[in-house]
Regions:
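Conserved nucleotide-sugar donor-binding subdomain of glycosyltransferases
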Residues: 69-106
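Short amphipathic alpha-helix
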Residues: 17-29
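Conserved nucleotide-sugar phosphate-binding/catalytic loop shared by glycosyltransferases and other
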Residues: 3-4, 8-15, 30, 34-83
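Anion (oxyanion) recognition and catalysis
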Residues: 29-30, 112
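Gly/Ser/Thr-rich loops at beta-strand to alpha-helix junctions
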Residues: 13-17, 104-107
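An aromatic- and histidine-rich active-site surface loop
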Residues: 44-46, 99-114
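A short helix->loop->beta-strand "cap" motif at the edges of active sites that frequently abuts
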Residues: 33-34, 114-117
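Active-site-proximal region of nucleotide-activated glycan assembly enzymes
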Residues: 117-141
């Protein structure tokens, strides 16, 4: 049986996505019919990974203001848009049967443009799902 070629793409900014990868990578590596590669976007913070990444991308990072919300002006100027587009163009997603994505932008856009199967496992994907709980609109008196 031909092994499943799986690319696991992780957002490396912050510890949450990397912590999930620490739990999932050993489980995926234990599967006999899976060939796993890992890519990371952003800067790893405080936590290591159980597998050496095939690629590291600068990716895309949000900048936050003093009130805690996204500072769109700083976000726009802090990112290298040409580097991001180049990374998307060069991402090796076509070499894989499936891409498992944890809020990693480079492979997400590369898969979208090339119509490669992708599964999004981030919390953000869960709250976007049609079956997820929705905020109720307040009643007007």
């Amino acid at each position: 049986m031909t092994p499943l070629r799986l690319l696991y793409a992780v957002q490396g900014t912050g510890n949450g996505h990397v912590a999930r990868a620490q739990a999932l990578v050993p489980l995926l590596l234990a599967q006999p019919n899976v060939r796993l590669d890992l890519v990371v976007s952003g800067t790893l913070v405080d936590v290591g990974l159980p597998l050496t990444p095939r690629e590291r991308y600068a990716g895309f990072s949000f900048r936050y203001g003093k009130s805690g919300g996204i500072d769109w002006f700083q976000t726009f100027w802090a990112n290298s848009w040409w580097k991001l587009l180049h990374s998307i163009q060069k991402a090796p997603v076509a070499e894989y049967d499936l891409v498992l994505n944890d809020f990693e932008p480079v492979t997400a856009y590369a898969c979208k443009w090339r119509k490669i199967p992708i599964i999004d496992i981030s919390h953000q994907a869960g709250v976007r799902h049609p079956g997820a709980a929705q905020l109720l609109q307040p009643r007007r008196a």
